[in-house]
Amino acid sequence: MKIQKNAVNVLERTSAYLRAGLLTKQPAWYNVVASVPPLKKFERVPKLTNPSNDRINGQLHSLDSSAGNNGMFKTRYTAKDRSNASKQLYSASKLTYIEDQLREIFYKQHPWELSRPKILIENNGDEKYDWSHMQQIGKPLDGESVVQRTLYLMKNKEAPSLVLAYDMARYEFYRLRMQQHIEEQVAQEEAEMFGSVFGPSAIEYGIQKEQKVIDTWKRKAIIQTEIMAARRINPSESWATDEKDPKKNDDIEEDVEEIKL
């Protein structure tokens, strides 16, 4: 099948039309396409190695000396094995970074750090921080501070291994976080001393709402338990009591309305 290249040559054809006078006005996309021209290399180049870890792509796995589930030994590669290996040469390599591994470890060990509020600020990505110390101006203390501090210690060879560098950054993070908690607690106590009144926090408010639902459920459960016990003792009287005393049913309906509100 012949490769179609008309769309790729749109810049050259448009330039020729402008010079010949066929187009009197330059298109709005002309300068953009001229600064970033489309790729004209259509052949598929095999990716022999993964750039992130220098692992060889398309390499067949070694044959296992142990028997499989069916009790048979595999002594040679099948056509499917060779096909899967060749596909890896032309597929995009999965890039891995040490920063992602450090983030995964940190937030797995400290899941409550993810519950802290985040400020999403649109920036250009050119922010420069001095990671010779963890506390930064204009950046809150979080897990990313531990990651960047660990990389700084490794890059400047202040730690012999990645594990020790991570531990050093983590302990420094603990000290700063405890200092931050003490400062917030002292500031709150000083404000209360001068008459400030603080309402419930988000967690306390959620617990209060949850407790209301639990209390409502408890009252309904007690009423239903009494009804079931009465029916087991004397079924005929229990049905008559329910018809004569609608107060319990009204209480249940009020509880349901409270939950809906």
UniProtKB/Swiss-Prot annotation:
Belongs to the mitochondrion-specific ribosomal protein mS23 family. Residues 234-261 are annotated as: Disordered. Component of the mitochondrial small ribosomal subunit. The keyword Acetylation does not apply. This is Small ribosomal subunit protein mS23. It is found in: Mitochondrion. Keywords: Mitochondrion, Ribonucleoprotein, Ribosomal protein. The keyword Membrane does not apply. One of its GO terms (molecular function) is structural constituent of ribosome. PANTHER family: 37S RIBOSOMAL PROTEIN S25, MITOCHONDRIAL, SMALL RIBOSOMAL SUBUNIT PROTEIN MS23. Residues 251-261 have a biased composition (Acidic residues). Pfam families: MRP-S25 (PF13741). GO terms for cellular component: mitochondrial small ribosomal subunit. Residues 241-250 have a biased composition (Basic and acidic residues). It comes from Vanderwaltozyma polyspora (strain ATCC 22028 / DSM 70294 / BCRC 21397 / CBS 2163 / NBRC 10782 / NRRL Y-8283 / UCD 57-17) (Kluyveromyces polysporus).
